[in-house]
Amino acid sequence: LCYKCVEACGTDAQNTFAIAVAGRGFDARISTEFDVALDDSACVFCGNCIGVCPTGALVFKSEFDMRAAGTWDESKQTRTETVCPYCGVGCVLELHAQEERIVKVTSPADSTVTEGHLCIKGRFGWIYAGDSRPRE
């Protein structure tokens, strides 16, 4: 276990401590605090655990779906840096686009503002970009 998601959810970024280590020794595994369902945990769905996962155990849903369909192709993706429009913090966003559609948003680890971390709006708010359908 590398614990990067636990650290991102804890003291490193979010301070919600929704992800923890459950079990001991050979039974140790990454889980939610008190081993409850994610919806019942302290998770704020910021996605910082996804952003730091080096193994691919945690990935963006868009990436998972595109990989399953065989359409995910990083060699065809462009990256564009911009600033998050949702608040005044000024987080640096890196938009990953494939076939002129945003497929995921990350933040550079060397960013002095975010150090690679984002809130839920910065990381997942892109789903509203370019979508003209009315939302409820």
Identify the residue ranges that each predicted region occupies.
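N-terminal export/assembly segments and adjacent metallocofactor-ligating motifs
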Residues: 1-136
